[in-house]
């Protein structure tokens, strides 16, 4: 009965992770387009500029992982003090800023900062609040509820 009460909350958490997976796919599948946008000459695949452009996109993706690593340690404490709902909303707001940054920036440095912030949004905000929220909303089988998060991240790879 309790899971039914929190069904929309669980679905919102799942869809947050769907956007997380989409972010990673968008960056990796459009690396040439992003490199062009960030000012790299991507006309000759054999040139050093082409390789530098691809490296810049890879760097932005790598900063996502670093943002996760840095923020995962304090996210749970913040979630306990501030509340899960506020952290989920804050993570969504950070993701919106990151997507806008990736979309409009002309700088690989700004894109790397956006990557870092998206990592913070994922681990520091969403992981710290979404995982416990899903577990608490479905106490009968919390492991299965958490598997739903991984399922939605996986589905995002097919979208």
Enumerate the predicted regions with their spans.
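Extracellular/periplasmic helix-loop-helix junction of adjacent transmembrane segments
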Residues: 30-69
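Glycine-rich segments within core transmembrane alpha-helices of 12-TM secondary carriers
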Residues: 141-159
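Hydrophobic core of transmembrane alpha-helices in multi-pass small-molecule transporters
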Residues: 110-125
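Extracytoplasmic
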Residues: 8-42
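Small-residue-mediated transmembrane helix hinge/kink sites in multi-pass secondary transporters
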Residues: 32, 73-77, 132
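Residue-level signature of mid-helix packing/kink "hotspots" within the transmembrane helices
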Residues: 25, 64-73, 158
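Conserved MFS/SLC helix-loop-helix module at the cytosolic interface between two early adjacent transmembrane helices
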Residues: 70-106
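Intracellular juxtamembrane helix-capping segments at the cytosolic ends
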Residues: 124-138
């Amino acid at each position: 009965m309790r899971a039914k009460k929190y069904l929309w909350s669980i679905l919102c958490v799942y869809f947050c992770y769907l956007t997380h997976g989409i972010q990673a796919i968008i960056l990796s599948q459009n690396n040439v387009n992003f490199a062009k946008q960030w000012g790299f000459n991507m006309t000759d695949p054999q040139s050093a500029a082409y390789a530098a452009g691809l490296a810049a996109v890879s760097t932005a993706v790598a900063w996502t992982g670093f943002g996760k690593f840095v923020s995962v340690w304090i996210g749970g404490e913040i979630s306990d003090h501030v509340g899960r709902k506020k952290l989920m909303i804050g993570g969504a707001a950070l993701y919106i800023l990151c997507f806008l940054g990736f979309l409009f920036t002309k700088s690989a440095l700004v894109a790397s900062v956006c990557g870092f912030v998206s990592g913070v949004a994922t681990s520091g905000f969403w992981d710290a609040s979404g995982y416990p929220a899903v577990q608490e909303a479905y106490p009968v089988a919390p492991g299965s509820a958490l598997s739903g998060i991984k399922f939605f991240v996986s589905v995002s790879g097919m979208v």
